[in-house]
């Protein structure tokens, strides 16, 4: 007898085939039958009117630290994610020598905006090597499965010490050691290696990260570990200032290792055609038999701004900045004072404070046409009429008056799309989502605690692209499900999941598609040391099943902890 039979749902099995009705049977953590009418089971779940999909496989998170203190891995678990991969963007916490722990926390804070006090309180540091780190992850109970990649920054600091932090060139011996560490990581189950080559990744002091200037000899030398072991992918984030150089070494990496190479791709205001040039290069590489892939986001990556967030238009005004150390409720109480409002609105941005900001953050003080109000549920494809500049023009107010009152009086968050919104709509994203050379990722779960929360991306993909979009064509649900199940699983070699077919791991979502909606992001204080972060919930998930065990029912955790560390090269994963 089966353990569970899900009866009469609309099955979208993750393969891309058309939806069909039927049952899904589960026994011993595996799917035993899909479709038709199945026999009795110890538990039967009525899925009439529900969509039945594989659990989401999210391959771009930053739960490297949170996986040590949070068995849920929220918010991802609230959105049907059953497998989360971290170690992205070259940042992580292993390997590490004791005297470099602070440096790695600084790098994680600078790159992914996870505060130092949170990391200091939450990390146990019961490891030095990457195998030690994997063992520490494996010892913990958790709700969903996790998978790790080896990150460049910690291994560069481990091998080179302060020379890495000063971004000195790696010697041949340095490269050999990093290659050995990477091979060791792959053998104990890392799914690949990642690095960062972007100026947007800096330490809290504004210094570029240790891997920023690594040359092709270093990258190719480390990458050769992938061909030695015969496993893993090579991932990279770059500004592509020298496109020819970057593409040349990526092609060489793919050719010499025979392993998949991927990079992060978005459109950018400063170079709207860059993404097209890069995709042309990807297709050319593929035509030459090379495995080169662009990892993309399914919506604009944008910063939310309000009271208590990492940034808002008034954080560079002296009077406002003086209040930032106060509790959020007290900040708002004072900001509601009409006299204080007049004083802040009359102030000019502090030039010294502005100079400390990145180029993007400087835009936040001036580009009122790029600020948008958010609804509940939030609208991630707002039209130009929703911008602060447009509202100000219609109502005969100044833009900063509109922004101040929205943030303070209405206690709301403004949305500033950083990338993927050059055209003011989602048409570029739609083109990317239709390109088989693109892989869906970039949810960034666990990162950018007080500025971004994109971990609800799986729910957004279905609700927005499959049902709610009004400013352009929608996409088929079968395509959207495949994009975040079998495609992501297959790319990284997670060969036992991502499809509802017999023999596969029984990771399943039951979704009331008509009710599926994202909530407005919420700022909460639930991290170690009282740290705050944005979270975002969703309605519509009737149940999420992991390894054949219900872990969430109607949005509530059942108490079950079937999650584990998935190791590449073990149990058939490669």
Region annotations inferred by a language model:
Residues 1-5, 11-55, 521:
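Histidine-rich, glycine-flanked metal-binding segment
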Residues 9, 29, 49, 60, ...:
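Divalent metal-coordination and catalytic microenvironments
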Residues 12-23, 415-423, 429, 476-479, ...:
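Acidic, glycine-enriched loop/beta-strand segments at the rims
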Residues 69-192:
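Divalent-metal coordination cores built from histidine and acidic residues
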Residues 133-137, 143, 149-159, 166-174, ...:
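Active-site neighborhoods of metal-dependent hydrolases
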Residues 401-407, 476-485, 500:
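Short, well-structured alpha-helical segments that form the helix of a local strand-helix-strand
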Residues 431-438, 443, 455-457, 510-562:
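C-terminal cap of metal-dependent C-N hydrolases
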């Amino acid at each position: 007898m089966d353990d569970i039979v899900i009866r009469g749902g609309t099955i979208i099995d993750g393969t891309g085939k058309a939806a069909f009705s039927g049952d899904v049977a589960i026994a011993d953590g595996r799917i035993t039958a899909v479709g038709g009418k199945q026999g009795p089971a110890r538990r039967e779940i009525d899925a009439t009117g529900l969509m039945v999909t594989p659990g989401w496989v999210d391959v771009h998170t930053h739960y490297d630290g949170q996986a040590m203190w949070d068995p849920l891995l929220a918010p991802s678990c609230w959105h049907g994610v059953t497998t989360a991969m971290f170690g992205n963007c070259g940042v992580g916490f292993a390997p590490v020598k004791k005297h470099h722990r602070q440096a790695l926390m600084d790098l994680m804070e600078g790159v992914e905006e996870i505060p130092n006090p949170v990391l200091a309180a939450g990390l146990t540091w019961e490891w030095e090597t990457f195998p030690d780190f994997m063992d520490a992850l494996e010892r913990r109970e958790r709700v969903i499965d996790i998978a790790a990649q080896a990150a460049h920054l910690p291994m560069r600091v481990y091998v080179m010490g302060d020379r890495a932090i000063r971004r000195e060139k790696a010697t041949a011996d340095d490269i050999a050691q990093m290659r050995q560490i990477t091979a060791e990581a792959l053998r104990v189950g890392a799914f690949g290696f990642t690095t960062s080559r972007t100026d947007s990744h800096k330490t809290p002091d504004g210094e570029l990260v240790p891997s920023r200037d690594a040359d092709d000899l270093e990258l190719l030398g480390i990458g050769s570990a992938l061909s030695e072991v015969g496993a893993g992918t090579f991932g990279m984030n770059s500004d592509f200032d020298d496109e020819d150089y970057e593409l040349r070494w990526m092609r060489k990496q793919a050719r010499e290792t025979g392993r998949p190479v991927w990079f992060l791709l978005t459109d950018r205001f400063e170079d709207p055609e860059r993404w097209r040039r890069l995709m042309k290069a990807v297709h050319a590489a593929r035509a030459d038999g090379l495995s080169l892939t662009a990892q993309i986001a399914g919506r604009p990556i944008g910063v939310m701004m309000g009271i208590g967030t990492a940034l808002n238009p008034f954080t560079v005004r002296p009077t406002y900045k003086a209040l930032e150390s106060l509790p959020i409720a007290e900040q708002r109480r004072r900001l509601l004072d009409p006299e204080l409002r007049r004083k802040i609105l009359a102030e000019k941005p502090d030039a010294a404070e502005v100079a400390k900001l990145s180029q993007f953050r400087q835009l936040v003080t001036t580009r009122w046409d790029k600020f948008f109000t958010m609804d509940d549920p939030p609208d991630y494809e707002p039209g130009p009429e929703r911008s602060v500049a447009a509202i100000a023009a219609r109502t005969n107010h100044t833009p900063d008056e509109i922004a101040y009152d929205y943030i303070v009086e209405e206690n709301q968050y403004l949305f500033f799309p950083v990338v993927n919104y050059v055209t003011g709509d989602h048409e570029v994203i739609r083109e990317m989502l239709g390109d088989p050379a693109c892989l869906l990722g970039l949810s960034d779960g666990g990162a950018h605690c007080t500025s971004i929360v994109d971990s609800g991306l799986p729910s957004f993909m279905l609700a927005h692209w499959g049902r709610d979009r009004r400013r352009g064509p929608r996409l088929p649900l079968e395509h959207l499900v495949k994009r975040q199940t079998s495609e992501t699983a297959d790319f990284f070699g997670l060969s036992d999941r991502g499809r509802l077919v017999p023999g596969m791991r029984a990771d399943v979502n039951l979704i009331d598609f008509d009710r599926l909606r994202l909530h407005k992001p919420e700022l909460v204080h639930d991290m170690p040391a009282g740290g705050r972060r944005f979270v975002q919930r969703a309605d519509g998930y009737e149940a999420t099943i992991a390894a054949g065990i219900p872990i969430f029912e109607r949005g509530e955790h059942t108490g079950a902890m079937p999650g584990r560390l998935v190791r590449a090269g073990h149990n058939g994963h490669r």
